[in-house]
UniProtKB/Swiss-Prot annotation:
Tissue: Retinal rod outer segment.
Gene3D superfamilies documented for this protein: GI Alpha 1, domain 2-like, P-loop containing nucleotide triphosphate hydrolases
One Pfam family in the UniProt entry: G-alpha
Residues with PTM ADP-ribosylarginine: 178
Chain positions covered by the region annotation G3 motif: 196-205
Subunit field text: G proteins are composed of 3 units; alpha, beta and gamma. The alpha chain contains the guanine nucleotide binding site.
Binding residues for Mg(2+): 47, 181
Clinical disorder: Achromatopsia 4: An ocular stationary disorder due to the absence of functioning cone photoreceptors in the retina. It is characterized by total colorblindness, low visual acuity, photophobia and nystagmus.
UniProt-recorded name of the protein: Guanine nucleotide-binding protein G(t) subunit alpha-2
Entry keyword Magnesium: yes
GO cellular component assignments: cytoplasm; heterotrimeric G-protein complex; photoreceptor inner segment; photoreceptor outer segment; photoreceptor outer segment membrane; plasma membrane; synapse
Subcellular location: Cell projection, Cilium, Photoreceptor outer segment; Photoreceptor inner segment
């Protein structure tokens, strides 16, 4: 009788030990899990950062996966040239070559009749002729006055390559492709012994109400703001400047009670586009009080200070900032390494080890 009870006790003790071990393993795993939230206004580059994580920390895009982006890229090309042609009417810009007016009409007819995501030779020729026209180029130069995909010139300048029958999108082509994010997209990867769960949330106003579900237990927020958006208006409200919207959103996030203990990293993104734009468009279009040099460094630092000055708890909460170009893999790799180090440092601080 006694030996039976003893065997039972041993079994219970064994099970208890296994459960303890499992709980400890789960706790260790949980401690090594980093919940990362990507926030920012629409078209600030969040989804491109997610694609970079796949390239840098997973095994990149296979040829089969790249091929799946072909239809998206063709859709982006068509939407871009259509946006420019429609804006010519709105802005009252004439074609340099009168025959291009026929091409403009033909473009609209073809766009309505072709299968989505395809690029028939007839359409390619029409787009090629239009893109070469001086009036179309003049309208492209005024892209801040209407809604145009950032990658428009990247694709249109390489029309021959991307419409070749054997075309396989490169990783750079994939990075520059644009699909509006709706809902929440989760990506998992590991770096420096940490398991990341990265959540990309739609940035347009209609998508933001879905963010609240992701708030609990967030380790770090990466907030993306497009530097180049200082002279642009929102897709969803053409009365609101994109930079002002981004600042308003950042203010509500960095001072939110939910994020009192959350590390916040600011990615001032699209620095490549900003560097080109700042040579032509003065920052005072967005910040009338700005009277500094209209240089990349001075204007960039001014924008950075506009964001960082919104932090009401500077004495206890540091916000880390980086100038980024989300389509540049090396730049993102370097910056994300720095973010990972921040997270490790903050974790050690929480444990009293730093």
């Amino acid at each position: 009788m006694g030996s039976g009870a003893s065997a039972e006790d041993k079994e219970l003790a064994k099970r208890s030990k296994e459960l303890e071990k499992k709980l400890q393993e789960d706790a260790d795993k949980e401690a090594k899990t980093v919940k990362l939230l990507l926030l920012g206004a629409g078209e600030s580059g969040k989804s491109t950062i997610v694609k970079q994580m796949k390239i840098i920390h997973q095994d990149g895009y296979s040829p089969e996966e790249c091929l799946e982006f072909k239809a998206i890229i063709y859709g982006n090309v068509l939407q871009s040239i259509l946006a420019i042609i429609r804006a010519m009417t709105t802005l009252g810009i004439d074609y340099a070559e009168p025959s291009c007016a026929d091409d403009g009409r033909q473009l609209n007819n073809l766009a309505d009749s072709i299968e989505e995501g395809t690029m028939p030779p007839e359409l390619v020729e029409v787009i090629r002729r239009l893109w070469k026209d001086g009036g179309v180029q003049a309208c492209f130069e005024r892209a801040a006055e209407y809604q145009l995909n950032d990658s428009a010139s990247y694709y249109l300048n390489q029309l021959e390559r991307i419409t070749d029958p054997e075309y396989l999108p490169s990783e750079q082509d994939v990075l520059r492709s644009r699909v509006k994010t709706t809902g929440i997209i989760e990506t998992k990867f590991s770096v420096k012994d940490l398991n990341f769960r990265m959540f990309d949330v739609g940035g347009q106003r209609s998508e933001r109400k879905k963010w609240i579900h992701c708030f609990e237990g967030v380790t770090c927020i990466i907030f993306c703001a497009a530097l180049s958006a200082y002279d642009m208006v929102l897709v969803e409200d053409d009365e609101v400047n994109r930079m002002h919207e981004s600042l308003h959103l950042f203010n509500s996030i960095c001072n939110h009670k939910f994020f009192a203990a959350t590390s916040i990293v600011l990615f001032l993104n699209k620095k490549d586009l900003f560097e080109e734009k700042i040579k032509k468009v003065h920052l005072s279009i967005c910040f009338p009080e700005y009277d500094g040099n209209n240089s990349y460094d001075d204007a960039g630092n001014y924008i950075k200070s506009q964001f960082l000055d919104l932090n009401m708890r500077k004495d206890v909460k540091e916000i880390y900032s980086h100038m980024t170009c989300a389509t540049d893999t090396q730049n993102v790799k370097f910056v994300f390494d720095a973010v990972t180090d921040i997270i490790i440092k903050e974790n050690l601080k929480d444990c009293g080890l730093f």
